[in-house]
């Protein structure tokens, strides 16, 4: 009776070597007898009912050869097969798409089955993709030892397998010949054919014994060529359109395909650092004073751009590295002193362009109070007396200084406003506030020199530690106020404390005067015993008698 049944188009029945088909059927004959009482619920030893023969006949037909398997999503597999299915293989293992899913019927609900898959070479050729088609490139490489992928639910009863689709979506393909994870090992650019095996489990819930019965089902549309990257763009399109995990490659509509744009690299990956540079670069080009602002993080927090707009600066590490201009003309800007000693910087970014038209922004915008850590080094009695205007050494304030013309009325100075070349270099910062003395006769010991600014702290500066030289600008301001309190017969009292340095051409006798001041420092008489302490050291009152 069993030999008269024909196989379906999509399934083939195989039997392991052993007894003949009739003997295998005879060996399976006791199973219906055991299953019949369970199905009918009759007690053992009772005579069979009238329907027992019908149940036994139905159970006899549920043998391994009667199992039918249908491929899920067969139409999708056919689309891939017509284009030439490709499956990606990687060292870590890659899942198949479309996934191998089947619908199984015709099993014995009480019998346990094991479902497994193996993938075998479809031919003995190696392929290459050329001229938009697959061509034979040579002889196939030696096949790797075949591996079987057993479904995780195995072994299970026929009722379990027939209840729902049987999915092998966790199966992974690899090209790692030493793979320890049980993935199926394949060679790239070779054609393979998956096969589904249904094996009846033995008494030990295993298979492989001499009398094991099994059947194999092969679907030709599931054959594929293993690749490390997709070769045919049609396959790429089909995968993107149908794979639910490829939504990121689609447009707003699922049917809108963007493969051409992906191939032309119209979606570049832009890092955050590049975006910061692009956002900051327009601000850098519009504000020429960003260079001095990069000295310390404190300066970035206390100072703003000069264009009148309150711009929000980024963190120092977010700014591009090359923000200093390559060339800078010192005659175009007033700026505070900036000297470098190792890695320390003194940046007081209070500058204003000669060419800049008068703006509506107040002068408080350009004169900022010193940073908090600078103020901590000053004496408490003099911190309140140091004004931002004195700290920045900015001249050209206009009508506030009598006898000094505005910025726009004077030509640019040949050097900077502080005459750096007139003072010999020191190991650290030497920021000095110079008083401008009106033209008048000097005492006798100054008759050999021309009129020049006083340098009140040269003697004190020689004994100052280099680490505290950053704050000499505040010291000198305090010392100038001390001199105002002390008696002096040579200098009139009507001279007020200047707001900054006066721009004038450097005197030809400047160097000689400096040397004379150095030599006369300790020879001058000092009459006051009152000493004023600051963050830089001790300065005594001078008399010019």
From Swiss-Prot:
SUPFAM superfamilies, alphabetically? Answer: p53-like transcription factors
Q: Please name the SMART domains in this protein's record.
A: TBOX
State where it is primarily located.
Answer: nucleus
**Top-level taxon of the source organism:** Eukaryota
Q: Where is the composition biased (Basic and acidic residues)?
A: 482-505
One GO cellular component assignment for this chain's record is: chromatin
Task: Region Disordered: list its residue ranges.
Answer: 479-509
Q: Which GO terms describe its biological process?
A: angiogenesis; cell fate specification; embryonic hindlimb morphogenesis; embryonic lung development; limb morphogenesis; lung development; morphogenesis of an epithelium; positive regulation of DNA-templated transcription
One Pfam family linked to the record: T-box
Q: Output the Gene Ontology terms for molecular function.
A: DNA binding; DNA-binding transcription factor activity, RNA polymerase II-specific; RNA polymerase II cis-regulatory region sequence-specific DNA binding
Q: Which controlled-vocabulary keywords does the entry list?
A: Developmental protein, Disease variant, DNA-binding, Nucleus, Phosphoprotein, Transcription, Transcription regulation
Which cell locations does it reside in?
Nucleus
DNA-binding segment(s): 71-251
Disease annotated for this entry: Ischiocoxopodopatellar syndrome with or without pulmonary arterial hypertension: An autosomal dominant bone disease characterized by patellar aplasia or hypoplasia and by anomalies of the pelvis and feet, including disrupted ossification of the ischia and inferior pubic rami. Amelia, posterior, with pelvic and pulmonary hypoplasia syndrome: An autosomal recessive, lethal embryonic syndrome characterized by absent hindlimbs, pulmonary hypoplasia, severely hypoplastic or absent pelvic bones, hypoplasia of the sacrum, and ambiguous genitalia.
User: What is the official name of this protein in its record?
Assistant: T-box transcription factor TBX4
Organism of provenance: Homo sapiens
